[in-house]
Amino acid sequence: MKLNTLQLENYRNYDEVTLKCHPDVNILIGENAQGKTNLLESIYTLALAKSHRTSNDKELIRFNADYAKIEGELSYRHGTMPLTMFITKKGKQVKVNHLEQSRLTQYIGHLNVVLFAPEDLNIVKGSPQIRRRFIDMELGQISAVYLNDLAQYQRILKQKNNYLKQLQLGQKKDLTMLEVLNQQFAEYAMKVTDKRAHFIQELESLAKPIHAGITNDKEALSLNYLPSLKFDYAQNEAARLEEIMSILSDNMQREKERGISLFGPHRDDISFDVNGMDAQTYGSQGQQRTTALSIKLAEIELMNIEVGEYPILLLDDVLSELDDSRQTHLLSTIQHKVQTFVTTTSVDGIDHEIMNNAKLYRINQGEIIK
C-alpha cells in the first residue's frame, strides 16, 4: 500500500498544496510550527476519518475557510484508487473511488497507517484509556466487523449509563429496562472482548521476537489483556453470555447506586511485562521506549498479515526520541518495505543508509519547498 499523491485544501495552515510522494521514505524538514505535523495528521485523518490530535473536526479547517479537503491517490497490488474527505462546520463526507460512503465503517480500512509519535511512549506508561484507544484504532483498521461491534457497544453503553443515572436520581424505578439493556450490552461486550483478546495474542506473538532482537535477547516481552469482564474464553458463546449476564446481575445494585456502568470493555487494560515485571511500574525509560517501538513494529507486520498490504508509517518527530541502536533497528526494519513519512527539524541525527533513497521536502509556513 502506497500513497502516490496527497492534496490538501484549507487544511490547518495549508491553503492548497499537492505532495507527490516517494514510494519509500519521505522526510519533511522544518522548524517547529511550520506545518510538518499537520501534514502527517492529514494522512492519518484521511485513513481513519478522525484526527489523533483533536476530537473537534472544525479545528482542521483553515482559519476563515468554510471547508477543508484531503484527497489521496493510493496504489495497491491490484491497482490505484482515490480517497477523499470533505470537512465542513456541519460534518464530514468521505468517498472511496469518488463514491460517497454512508458509514465510516465502510470507509475505514482502505488506507492503513501506523503512527509513531513521542506521545505514543504513553502507551506503556500512560492511562488505560490510552491503551484502549490504541487497540480500537489499530484493530479497527483491519476489521470492519470489530468497528461495527464497538460502535454498537458504545451506543448501548451510552443508553445504559443514561438509564442508570435516572435510576440513581430516582427519575426511573423499573429495572426491567435495565435488564433488557444488560442483555444487549452483554452480547456486544463479549464480541468486543473476544476480538481484543485475539488481537493482543497475535500482536504479542509478533512483538516478542522484535523486542528480543532490539535487546540482543537480554529482555523478554509479554502482553497481557486485562478485561474488565472476566470469563472463560474456552466456553461456547451461550455459556460466555450467561457468565457475563451473571456478573452484570450480581452488580446491578452497585451500578444503580453509582449511576454508571462498572464493567465492560470501556474499562479494559493491557499490561506490558519485561522479564516478568510490569514495564509501566518497574520499567526504565529505555525499557518503556523499547516496548513501545516493539509494539509499533509488530503492528506493521500484523496489518500486512491481516490485509495483505503493508501500512503507511508516520514518524512524527520520534527519531530524536530514540537512541542510535533503537533508531537503527527501526529504520532497518522498514527499509524498502514500508512507505514512511518522517517529520524532523534536522536530518543531521539520522545516520542510516535509508537516507540515500529518501525524498526531502522543506516545510515553511504551510508551503512545501522541494
Swiss-Prot record:
This is DNA replication and repair protein RecF. Pfam families: SMC_N. One of its GO terms (cellular component) is cytoplasm. NCBIfam families: recf. It comes from the Bacteria. Its main location: cytoplasm. GO terms for biological process: DNA replication; DNA synthesis involved in DNA repair; double-strand break repair; SOS response. GO terms for molecular function: ATP binding; single-stranded DNA binding. It is found in: Cytoplasm. Keywords: ATP-binding, Cytoplasm, DNA damage, DNA repair, DNA replication, DNA-binding, Nucleotide-binding, SOS response. SUPFAM superfamilies: P-loop containing nucleoside triphosphate hydrolases. The RecF protein is involved in DNA metabolism; it is required for DNA replication and normal SOS inducibility. RecF binds preferentially to single-stranded, linear DNA. It also seems to bind ATP. PROSITE patterns: RECF_1 (PS00617), RECF_2 (PS00618). It comes from Staphylococcus aureus (strain NCTC 8325 / PS 47). HAMAP family: RecF. ATP binds at residues 30-37. Belongs to the RecF family.
